[in-house]
């Protein structure tokens, strides 16, 4: 029969193991839910790999929108320094057009083309997603008003 002290020690050890496993599973779930934002220049400097789900923001390059062999829409996102090829098989937003700011979310295929699952276009002529504006500012091509991007002057658009 196990003495009282040994039984308490076994209970504490089992509780610690359960806690470590729970924290580990929680961190794994959180990591799979996180989507990092990149500019085309950041991707050129440090490619995130083909397994990573990412967001890329920038401007749709003029005269880059076309149809891929698969029937998907193919276009290029630029920050005026580097470019990222994108393919998207869904319906594009009504405000999607060349020269317009976009944020796409997806994964890179083995051929280096970003396979987008979602495409978000800016919703009016004054809004620029803060991540996109910051990436353009860092690339030295920000053409917006003032030092900080705003969501159409409404303070916080969330």
UniProtKB/Swiss-Prot annotation:
Record: residues binding heme: 123, 127
UniProt GO cellular component terms: plasma membrane
Membrane topology term: Single-pass type II membrane protein
Annotated function: Heme chaperone required for the biogenesis of c-type cytochromes. Transiently binds heme delivered by CcmC and transfers the heme to apo-cytochromes in a process facilitated by CcmF and CcmH.
Keywords: Cell inner membrane, Cell membrane, Cytochrome c-type biogenesis, Heme, Iron, Membrane, Metal-binding, Signal-anchor, Transmembrane, Transmembrane helix
GO-annotated biological processes: cytochrome complex assembly
NCBIfam families listed in its UniProt record: PRK13254.1-1, PRK13254.1-5
Source organism per UniProt: Maricaulis maris (strain MCS10) (Caulobacter maris)
Residues annotated as transmembrane: 9-29
A Pfam family assignment: CcmE
GO molecular function, one term: metal ion binding
Ranges where the record places region Disordered: 139-158
Residue ranges, Periplasmic side: 30-158
UniProt record similarity statement: Belongs to the CcmE/CycJ family.
Coiled-coil intervals, chain numbering: none
Cytoplasmic side: 1-8
Protein known as: Cytochrome c-type biogenesis protein CcmE
Localization per Swiss-Prot or TrEMBL: Cell inner membrane
InterPro entries: CcmE (IPR004329), CcmE-like_sf (IPR036127), NA-bd_OB-fold (IPR012340)
